[in-house]
Amino acid sequence: MEIKEYNPREIEEKWSRYWIEKALYHVEKPDKRKKFSVVIPPPNVTGSLHMGHALNATLQDVIVRWQRMRGRECVWVPGFDHAGIATQYVVEKQLAKEGKSRLELGREEFLKKVWEWVPKSRNAIRTQLTKLGVSVDWKRERFTLDEGFSRAVRKAFRTLFEEGLIYRAEYIVNWCPNDRTALSDLEVEYEEEKGSLWYIKYPIVDENGKDTGEFITVATTRPETMLGDTAVAVNPNDDRYKHLVGKRARLPLVNWERKDLRGNSVSNLIPIIADERVKMDFGTGAVKITPAHDPLDFEIGKTHDLPFVRVIDETGRMNENAGDFAGMDRYEAREAIVAKLREDELLEKEEEITHSVGHCYRCKTVIEPMVSVQWFVKVSDPRIKDISIKVVEEGIKEREEKELFVQLAQVEELSVVIPLKEEGRHKIVVVLDKTAKFLVGKREGELAYIYYPKGDERTLEFAKRLAEEFKDYEFMVAYEGLPKIVVMGNEQLVEPGSYLFVYDGKKLDLYKLEGEKPKFLKTLGKGEADLEVTQKSIQIKPERIKKVEEREKRVKFIPEHWKKFYLDWMYNLKDWCISRQIWWGHRIPVWYCKDCGNVNVFTDDDFDRAHDKIIFNLIADGKIDQEFTPEEVEKVLKSPHFVHPEMTVLDFYKKFVFHRYYNMDITADSLRLLFTQDMNPMAMLTPGVSTRNIYKYDSQKKKWKMVLRCKKCGSENLEQERDVLDTWFSSALWPFGVFGWPESTEDLKNLYPTDLLVTGFDIIFFWVARMIMMGTHFMKDIPFYDVYVHALVRDKYGRKMSKTIGNVIDPLDIIERYGADALRFTLAILTVQGRDIKLAEEKFEGYKHFANKIWNAARYVLMNTPEDFIARIPYMAPLKPEDKWIITKLNETAEEVNKALENYQYSQAAHAIYEFFWSDYCDWYIEFTKERIYKKAPEDNEEEKAKVENERTTALYTLHYVLEKALRILHPFMPYITEELWHKLPNAEGESISLAEFPQKNEDEIYEEDKQKVERLKEIISAIRAIRSDLQIKPSEKIKASFKTESEFSRRVIQEFKNHILNLAKLESFEEVSQRPQNTVATFSKDTEIYVHIEGHVDLDKLIQSYEKKREKLLKELERVNKKLSNENFLKKAPVEVVEKEKQIKEELENDLKKVEEILKVLRS
């Protein structure tokens, strides 16, 4: 078969399209017992994916594809995050370029701009994920701001609010004056910065408010906040200030009226208080207390019932409480206040310091601690905190009660024939010497069976797959006494079959059970079978039994050290500020009653009919106004859905929101009729029509209004909360929200908890912890079993990738240049647990060469495969030792890869298949086969001709057999090239390699003796090749060599594989000698001394001289580099990449020098 050159772009486009069109990765109704579910960490709709996203998606896809090939029903849910602050920030920057701001546009128009941006970003990300080759189920795609998720968010908020776990309070928050919103503690990034510590003198006053001439000096880094001071605090154990506690001080500069948060006037004469939280060794030991602008001061202010005076507003400017400094920027005010203090001789001194300053994680603005009214989740409450710690620290127990049936068959010296309804029409005859008990399936009459014919490898593989598939089922067979089993086919006795029993997932040999107590054996499968009794009748009595299974559920962090990282944070948990003063996001579902002050939380639970629920959700989502026309509703519901444009918004409501198909008419006329009936008082007199009085009609505006009423006083005078929820609030619901919560859906029952979460360490607190909190609270179960925490992707010098530095590597550029398979394999092989990835573009180029190697190996196999290859297989010659060696290595590689992936050892798994394919299969086995592949058969000798053809067929059979399985092992890492090549193989069956079985180690294919022989052969050939290279003998030049050995094993290997040694080491001869011949250079290979004859090939003296010159040059260069790296000035001032480059040069020089010295030692010998 002809196979053209490798073209990554062509095959990637072809197979991406194929996978999506075939919906290969969609499982309509997954089986809970076989499922493997994963939810993608939803990328933000803020732009395109970076290399960190590519790594995350690759690591997930490797595991998902591997699990799918192991027989699991994999459901990997894709989706996107609306990313409140981040997305709003991106759109605001775009508006700024046009000279506009969101405040000028207003909320409604600004949100329209965001909705114009979001589809562009989402489509770009979806395209990138598709190019990367991820095997997600696009039919289940979700968005954190879609109708179903928005409904789930409102439900979660209401539930927590009614449970007293959401509250609204005055609190000190991290305020970003640029984004004008509160930030959680996790959204603040701290940086060490140079600053000043100002020492300010506060005059002490007497009981009449007159200065006493005494001062108390306080130290502060933020003099601008002193205008809001309401106390001075000292430690009660500080002897320096005990005499001042209880007295008052005059606040410097302030000679104007100040008001607290409730509008009460606050004096400029402030108390001196004692509090143990004051550090005696900071500054002077006396500190100013500004409860409205400092977290510790806030706590101290609450303890001592101090007034809260705000002096900085939401924009970072001084407010009316700042008097003479009002209107100034906070930093401008700082300078002015310091100057005034200096002028009034109240500034004692100024010290330069380095301190930690908090910045907004998004825009890098210095945050302003500020008291404001915010919404919080009480995550410190034991109802949330305790279980979130327990599921990670010790796990939780889950009990499940199952009902089974026991069928007790009383038989004695009796044969039972079990006809199997399988292809082949075989029967199993069970000859029972004693009573047998069958403990069988879920319903009466369902008998478990075990069977595979001897010698049929395909059925053996099928049986093993069944064993894996059913090992966790509640099917068991208990035998008392030892049955004898034979296989009947076509009513004639044939050779007794082999049989496979599985116990605890392990293969058992039935013969070894003799004399032991009865075993409970888990069967390979299930099936209905009639019992055909050949001698006597038997009585089977079904009996129901109940079995209670208890299993532990625990969230496991990988690597394990992240468990401590998580728990340390959880034990010191603070309540979570969830309100954000922005416009893009989930608007808090709270309506304040202007008449009675009641706080109302509305969800669609407040409505009965599907129409009303939908209209409420459209209003709450901002898709229509509270006043609307029926035409507006119809237009929205009939428009294509944002996430799934193949369906309408109404279809999305039916499938993803309510999960049932209401038969509803949503035309404008039908809605108008519905509203009219609802508001008509006469409707009460109409049989079958109920009145709800939900809608009102405004004849002037010609619009209908959905009426919301206060749940306390019934007033319609309500105002909705303007803040939106923190993005992470909706993201915390992701693992169960995507499966339809709060509805009790089949997906939710079958796919939750999910099996794996792959994420970066930087969002363990932001996201992972909160998913655990919300999952355990709402679902009463863990959200996922395994959390794999991957490291950061850095540049080759270990620096974080940054546009500022200019070291960002775009995954799309890499795919364009080297292909998605090269990108994926590079990221996987570099992923070592607990170690950051240092990424250089040459790495991708290297693994593109690997893809080429795979392609060319397949070309070699296919181009040498005749059209009648399959027909020739029955006549092939027995396997040679090199055939058995490569099959053994294949099985060992399969075992190593499986074990590595079970433990998320990506690098180890990738290295194993890389070494096998590149070295064992390509560099060695293909070379071994060339003698048989290209050997010409004599035309005049039919017997010899048949022998040559049959040996060629054996080589081709082994090449195909190993290639097909190796492609399957490679597939999770390199899906495109493996899919393309697999379909070209004659022994590949099925619509996709991704649905083929992942190879397992087969003990029957381990040929240890042949493996040892071929490994010894490789060592001998490698030793000869190495010395040839050192002697600089041309690869095409044939030379003589000889050997001496005391090892009988090595002697036999050389004799058996003499032709391979001559061909692959390019030798004229290789004979055994008793002593070293003259004019030879010696090398060793374990127990064998090898002599290469150099006469006529090498000028030894000249070669030694050449290597000595090379050694001298290396020593000089190494001396230069060492001198540079020992220079402290160079190490401090040179850029990181320059220092790293010099270190790499040093390492390379040392390796080269070592090699040259080893060669010289050999040559001089």
Swiss-Prot record:
Domain of life: Bacteria
UniProt catalytic activity: tRNA(Val) + L-valine + ATP = L-valyl-tRNA(Val) + AMP + diphosphate
Keyword Coiled coil part of the UniProt annotation: yes
Coiled coil: 1001-1032, 1097-1165
Signal peptide extent: none
GO molecular function, one term: ATP binding
Name the UniProt record assigns to this protein: Valine--tRNA ligase
Gene name of this polypeptide: valS
